[in-house]
Amino acid sequence: MVKLVFARHGESEWNKANLFTGWADVDLSEKGTQQAIDAGKLIKEAGIEFDLAFTSVLTRAIKTTNLALENAGQLWVPTEKSWRLNERHYGALTGKNKAEAAEQFGDEQVHIWRRSYDVLPPAMAKDDEYSAHKDRRYADLDPALIPDAENLKVTLERAMPYWEEKIAPALLDGKNVFVGAHGNSIRALVKHIKGLSDDEIMDVEIPNFPPLVFELDEKLNIVKEYYLGGE
């Protein structure tokens, strides 16, 4: 039996300010830093030992991964970064205050953009200050792969190749895996792992803390699912 641990990044400065973040590269808040440290302590207390770690290319997830592994006494664990684990791209909503967006577009419309499985928010302009098209970390990526907006369906579609090529093979090889990522990229993978319907996944929330653990059998069927610390 293997363990797959998902840790959503700790609270970010934009989480704190109630802003849509998506692919914008925002740092952890002081609270978020402590959440990442505490995640590592919970991992250590649980006696979980990792063989591999995966994270996104966004600072808040990378820092959470590093702090969690460090405080679990496992900073040495090989870690791979991929844009495919990035947060869902919120398009033109990126950087907007969620309450102000609701005032501008209406509560119902913003709720649909945030919570529906397959409705896209307005696209981000390629010359937007937060556009990934001019971000050096994506310089080697085919521009056609860089999104201007995503829903959960599209997020799952771009995360799945990474699951199938990297994460699942490691688990099938008997390795314990840590994934430090984002609320929606984790939700997308949880939908796949649990076989949830499009409607069922909409009620699933991934908190910034504590980490979510899946114990899986040799065919990656779920044996046990729980949050560390009993929360």
Curated annotation (Swiss-Prot):
One of its GO terms (biological process) is glycolytic process. Pathway: Carbohydrate degradation; glycolysis; pyruvate from D-glyceraldehyde 3-phosphate: step 3/5. PANTHER family: PHOSPHOGLYCERATE MUTASE. Keywords: Gluconeogenesis, Glycolysis, Isomerase. Catalyzes the interconversion of 2-phosphoglycerate and 3-phosphoglycerate. It comes from Streptococcus pyogenes serotype M6 (strain ATCC BAA-946 / MGAS10394). Substrate binds at residues 8-15, 21-22, 60, 87-90, 98, 114-115, 183-184. The record marks H182 as: Transition state stabilizer. Belongs to the phosphoglycerate mutase family. BPG-dependent PGAM subfamily. The active site is at H9 (tele-phosphohistidine intermediate), E87 (proton donor/acceptor). GO terms for molecular function: phosphoglycerate mutase activity. SMART domains: PGAM. The keyword Cell cycle does not apply. This is 2,3-bisphosphoglycerate-dependent phosphoglycerate mutase. The keyword Isomerase applies.
